[in-house]
């Protein structure tokens, strides 16, 4: 896949996640008993045979880069995370953290498109050559995917842009970017979070641009009255400009973890008889030395993902329990996510909740008959 530059947009604060996101970078929110949200897109890039992925971040970027450097760089032969203007100092610190980073000399970014512009010298190069395509990814999507087929179709079609999409129930489309295509698979409409959806297709938020075309539109939009956003500005401008934009359907599981209730609901999907993602399909980045098991039934645990080192003296039902957690004597956790090291006190009964590392409890919507997005 020479010529493809993978770019990972990692926002930051996770304000809509409530206590789960407080004091934590949203990309590093734990997921599935095995990983953090950002690890899924990184693992997909590695799985697709690409050599690296460029991290574009701003909010507490030192904290995020330090974490990813220790967790990912040096662990997978021939693959690493590129930190753009900071990358040289991280390369000089294999297996450890640099003492000091270069001073920031570029302006603050006001949106996803701004991130591409301000870091253009890193975005549009792949190794020592100019990139031919830019693969844009986000840090809060849960899915297992190989981008190879999408890249091949994009190149064969000579498209300016290929957007991923998925079919969902129309009542949920207003939460996403809505897309429509003609009979030849060409994009005809793109609307971010429409009030009155006319399609049941939504943008799955990863896309592949022809690099030269993307750069041209970014330069055209620079200095105009725009929102500095890929979905709200760049893609609509390309559509209005008559560019060839194709769609690529994502038929496997894909989830945008935008709110705490969607986060909690996504964990339920892991515990179904036909799980949305198998344990073996998820990156193992949180305490990777500790085995995990999907336990269908047994003493004190039923239909749950439980780490091998969990101290369980109670009852775990339909829950995901991370390494280092403790379930107290006669405690019951049902439909819960128990984060690493969390303690559930003796005699506590919890249902439809997230237990944070400090033991505080965040309640979620109780389970009801619903189709997952």
Swiss-Prot record:
Please list every transmembrane segment annotated in the UniProt record, as residue ranges. Answer: none
Q: Which Gene3D superfamilies match?
A: Hexapeptide repeat proteins, Spore Coat Polysaccharide Biosynthesis Protein SpsA, Chain A
Enzyme class, broadest EC rank = transferase
Report, from the record, the phenotype seen after gene disruption.
Cells lacking this gene are unable to produce both validoxylamine A and validamycin A.
Tagged with keyword Nucleotidyltransferase:
yes
> Could you tell me which InterPro entries the record lists for this protein?
ADP-Glc_PPase, NTP_transferase_dom, Nucleotide-diphossugar_trans
Does GTP-binding show up as a keyword for this record? yes
* Source domain of life: Bacteria
User: Which metal ions or organic cofactors does this protein require, according to UniProt?
Assistant: Mg(2+)
EC numbers listed for it are 2.7.7.91
Q: Which parts of the sequence bind substrate?
A: 177, 192-193
Q: Which keywords does this chain's UniProt record carry?
A: GTP-binding, Magnesium, Metal-binding, Nucleotide-binding, Nucleotidyltransferase, Transferase
Give the catalytic activity: valienol 1-phosphate + GTP + H(+) = GDP-valienol + diphosphate
Task: List the Gene Ontology MF annotations in alphabetical order.
Answer: glucose-1-phosphate adenylyltransferase activity; GTP binding; metal ion binding
Q: Which residues form a coiled coil?
A: none
Protein's GO biological process: glycogen biosynthetic process
Q: Which family does it belong to?
A: Belongs to the bacterial/plant glucose-1-phosphate adenylyltransferase family.
- What is the annotated role of this protein in its UniProt record? Involved in the biosynthesis of the antifungal agent validamycin A. Catalyzes the conversion of valienol 1-phosphate to GDP-valienol. Also able to use efficiently ATP as nucleotidyl donor, but other NDP derivatives are less efficient.
What is this protein identified as?
Valienol-1-phosphate guanylyltransferase
Q: Which gene encodes it?
A: valB
């Amino acid at each position: 896949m020479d010529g493809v530059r993978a770019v990972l947009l990692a926002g930051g604060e996770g304000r809509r996640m409530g206590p789960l996101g407080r004091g934590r970078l949203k990309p590093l929110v734990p997921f599935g008993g095995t990983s953090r949200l950002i690890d899924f897109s990184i693992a997909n890039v590695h799985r697709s045979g690409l050599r690296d992925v460029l991290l574009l971040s701003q909010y507490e970027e030192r904290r995020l880069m330090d974490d990813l450097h220790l967790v990912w760089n040096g662990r997978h032969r021939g693959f690493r995370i590129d930190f753009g203007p900071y990358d040289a100092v991280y390369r000089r610190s294999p297996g450890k953290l640099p003492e000091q980073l270069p001073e920031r000399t570029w302006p603050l970014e006001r949106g996803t498109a701004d991130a591409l512009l301000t870091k253009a010298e890193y975005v549009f190069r792949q190794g020592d050559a100019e990139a031919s395509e830019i693969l844009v990814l986000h840090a809060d999507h849960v899915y297992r995917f190989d981008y190879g087929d999408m890249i091949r179709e994009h190149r064969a079609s000579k498209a300016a842009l290929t957007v991923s999409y998925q079919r969902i129930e129309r009542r949920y489309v207003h939460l996403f970017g809505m897309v429509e295509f003609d009979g030849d698979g060409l994009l005809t409409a793109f609307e971010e979070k429409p009030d009155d959806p006319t399609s049941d297709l939504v943008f799955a938020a990863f896309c592949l641009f022809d690099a030269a075309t993307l750069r041209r539109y970014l330069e055209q939009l620079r200095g105009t009255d725009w929102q500095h956003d890929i979905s709200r500005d760049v893609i609509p401008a390309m559509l209005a400009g008559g560019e060839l934009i194709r769609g690529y359907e994502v038929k496997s599981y894909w989830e945008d973890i935008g709110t705490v209730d969607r986060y909690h609901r996504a964990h339920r999907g892991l515990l179904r008889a036909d799980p949305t993602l198998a344990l073996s399909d998820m990156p193992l980045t949180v305490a990777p030395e500790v085995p995990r098991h999907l336990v269908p039934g047994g003493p004190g645990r039923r239909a749950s993902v439980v780490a091998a080192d969990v101290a369980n003296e109670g009852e775990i039902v339909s829950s995901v329990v991370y390494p280092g957690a403790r379930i107290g004597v006669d405690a019951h956790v049902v439909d819960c996510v128990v984060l690493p090291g969390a303690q559930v006190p003796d005699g506590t009964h919890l249902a439809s909740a997230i237990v944070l590392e400090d033991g505080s409890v965040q309640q979620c919507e109780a389970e009801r008959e619903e189709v997952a997005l």
